[in-house]
UniProtKB/Swiss-Prot annotation:
Cofactor binding, per record: Binds 2 Zn(2+) ions per monomer.
UniProt organism field: Vibrio cholerae serotype O1 (strain ATCC 39315 / El Tor Inaba N16961)
Signal sequence bounds: none
Function: Participates actively in the response to hyperosmotic and heat shock by preventing the aggregation of stress-denatured proteins and by disaggregating proteins, also in an autonomous, DnaK-independent fashion. Unfolded proteins bind initially to DnaJ; upon interaction with the DnaJ-bound protein, DnaK hydrolyzes its bound ATP, resulting in the formation of a stable complex. GrpE releases ADP from DnaK; ATP binding to DnaK triggers the release of the substrate protein, thus completing the reaction cycle.
Domain J: 5-70
Residues annotated as binding Zn(2+) 1: 149, 152, 202, 205
Comment on protein domains: The J domain is necessary and sufficient to stimulate DnaK ATPase activity. Zinc center 1 plays an important role in the autonomous, DnaK-independent chaperone activity of DnaJ. Zinc center 2 is essential for interaction with DnaK and for DnaJ activity.
Annotated family: Belongs to the DnaJ family.
Zinc finger (CR-type): 136-214
Protein name stated in the entry: Chaperone protein DnaJ
InterPro entries noted in UniProt: DnaJ, DnaJ_C, DnaJ_domain, DnaJ_domain_CS, HSP40/DnaJ_pept-bd, HSP_DnaJ_Cys-rich_dom, HSP_DnaJ_Cys-rich_dom_sf, J_dom_sf
One GO term of the biological process aspect: response to heat
Cofactor: Zn(2+)
Residues reported to bind Zn(2+) 2: 166, 169, 188, 191
Amino acid sequence: MSKRDFYEVLGVGRDASERDIKKAYKRLAMKYHPDRNSGDAGAAEKFKEVKEAYEILTDAQKKAAYDQYGHAAFEQGAGGFGGGGFGGGGADFGDIFGDVFGDIFGGGRRGGGPRAQRGSDLRYNMELSLEEAVRGCSKEIEVPTLVHCDACDGSGAKKGTSAQTCGTCHGHGQVQMRQGFFAVQQTCPTCHGKGKIIKDPCNVCHGQGRKQKTKTLNVKIPAGVDTGDRIRLSGEGEAGEMGAPAGDLYVQVHVKEHHIFERDGNNLYCEVPVSFAMAALGGEVEVPTLDGRVSLKVPAETQTGRMFRMRGKGVKGVRSAALGDLIVKLVVETPVNLSARQKELLKEFEESCGGEAATKHKPKAEGFFNGVKKFFDDLTS
């Protein structure tokens, strides 16, 4: 059976650049790869055909011969190139698929020998009072972690000895497995990717190069932090393997509930009780802030639930120098534990206002009852 044109196989024109050829090859190789088409003989043939076309068209000398003579250039005795299939020189699978199959099939090429594992990151949950969060503070914490073993200087080998190069992977930490025409790199099963074998392990860390320890750290909390904020302490996580960098420690902030204030961003909220008389006649009430007490003027005829904004009496955020506001909600308290005389006076006051049915001095009641009347009128109309 005659061979298909190599340009047709890859779906590119004869003027295609090497980049276009490589792009087409990757797409088709992924489509017909045996690992994706197990037991499909047709896909295997197409994969072989695509590979052969790629090897010819990305080799300048072979491409020139193919462009001039076609497939005849690679037949026995036609030009000394030898077979144009898988057995020829061709491209290195690892170079071609390093960025494509590395994640899909685990076969991505990794250069530079074994890679020591960076230490794991750690998290510490820290509770703060509102005052501590707003003003900033320093906190001493204890963190159980893995630290560099001083006895073996992190090598894992007993003092006076050293780790030996792994004989299986020759220090690379990986071995190459071939599945047909496809090369896959895997972690070395002997040294588990470290590239070295410890024959005489350290008595302190038992060959790990790291040991358990509880570290005491002083953490500076910046002013303005809030629940959900995270403080990163670089290099304070677990020690890395074989001298690799340590991980980081993340301090997760949680601000406890306050008995007076609620915080929303840079604003603070609080409720302040006022007497029935002050709400009706007006006056002044002391309001708490994080910096001390301040006076708030209460206008006459203030209704319960009215909000007052005290500008600049909130807090500064960790990312902003602007002060928030204090939002004060006045709550009119109903008097309790009244004496007989006090009850008498209240009854006299109620009668002076026209009794329970009167709404002249009760703006909310007037609005409410008018609304109720309209509601029932609409139902019966």
